[in-house]
Design a protein with these regions (language model features):
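Alpha-helical transmembrane segments of integral membrane proteins
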Residues: 1-325
């Protein structure tokens, strides 16, 4: 895909928001038809709040860019709503149940509501496509385990992210775990370059933060742009955490394989570093090596964040039902 340009394409952002809401409706309909063991009315309210945030983000993006196009500036109400969505989305995420599909669905809605506010074109569709790919990956790994008779659980609906903390359910490493680790590294690189070469400063468009601020503030704008870059990484890391749970393998064991693959990549690019030729060739070879080394450290941070987002849940007081005698 080409680098995101400076000409905004808001209809694509609106289409991404509407597509997210459509997928959410189908997912909620499927959830309502599921067994009562995995459904709670209070949990459904959380999903409706998240869907409302996605719809609100879609409206704010459209309204803000129309206002800026008409030379009317950033509406104060849109700015307040944008910051409220940015703060409330992670909280709503942690209120959802920790069952595998329900938590992954909640992660998608929370991150999409933020990503839409930071999008100006086709990149708004990228998290949806990436999440669909992650969904297929998790199902594929579960089907592979069932084929070889290594999984004792027939349905992914039975998996809970909190099982990852139970050491009694861990198994030994297999050769297939190398494939899973390689896929994770491949998807991380895909998330890195999915919307263009983010190693280039030309890929960052200040128009992406116009829903939050229009006054030049380098630190604030830089932080928001880094958040936009990190969201696809979070999706991939959470999917990798789901793979670890479904395959009943310790997260540390599987992530050590990832680090070995990353070190091999870093060693390969280290031998490609040039100290001769044009300045462009020298700078490109050095930047490739630095990016791979930084990616290794960044994956460790993302792995810890994914464990937090998938296993933790904020408890709210539930209303008790009183029966009259």
């Amino acid at each position: 895909m080409p680098v995101v340009g400076r000409d905004p394409n808001i209809p694509l952002v609106i289409a991404a928001g509407l597509l997210t809401l459509l997928i959410s409706c189908f997912s909620l309909a499927s959830l309502c038809k599921s067994e009562n063991k995995y459904r709670d009315n209070e949990d459904l309210k959380v999903y409706f709040y998240q869907m409302f945030s996605v719809a609100l983000s879609t409206y704010v993006v459209s309204s803000t860019h129309n206002s800026l196009k008409n030379k009317q500036g950033l509406p104060v109400m849109n700015q307040i709503i944008s910051w409220m969505i940015l703060v409330s989305s992670p909280v709503l995420l942690l209120l959802s149940p920790t069952f595998l599909f329900q938590r992954l669905f909640s992660i998608l809605l929370s991150l999409m509501s933020i990503y839409l506010l930071l999008s100006t074109g086709y990149e708004a569709l990228f998290p949806l496509v990436l999440f669909g790919l992650m969904f297929v990956w998790v199902n594929m790994e579960q089907e592979a385990l069932q084929h070889y008779g290594l999984s004792r659980k027939p349905k992914l609906a039975f998996f809970n992210f909190t099982y990852a903390m139970d050491i009694t359910q861990f198994r030994q490493l297999h050769l297939d775990d190398i494939r899973r680790s390689f896929f994770f590294v491949f998807f991380i690189v895909t998330a890195f370059f999915g919307t263009g070469n983010i190693a280039s400063i030309n890929s960052f468009d200040p128009a992406s933060v116009y829903c939050f601020l229009t006054v030049f503030s380098p630190f604030m704008m830089g932080g928001l742009l880094l958040l936009k870059v990190a969201i696809p990484f979070v999706l991939v890391s959470c999917a990798f955490e789901a793979v670890q749970v479904t395959t009943q393998l310790s997260s540390k064991s599987l992530f050590l394989i990832v680090l070995v693959i990353s070190d091999i990549m870093a060693l390969y690019f280290f031998f490609l570093v040039k100290d001769y030729g044009s300045w462009l060739d020298i700078g490109t070879s050095i930047s490739h090596y630095v990016l791979v080394m930084s990616l290794t450290i960044f994956m460790m941070v993302m792995n810890g964040l994914a464990q937090l987002l998938t296993t933790q849940r904020l408890g709210l007081p539930r209303r008790t039902k009183h029966h009259s005698t």
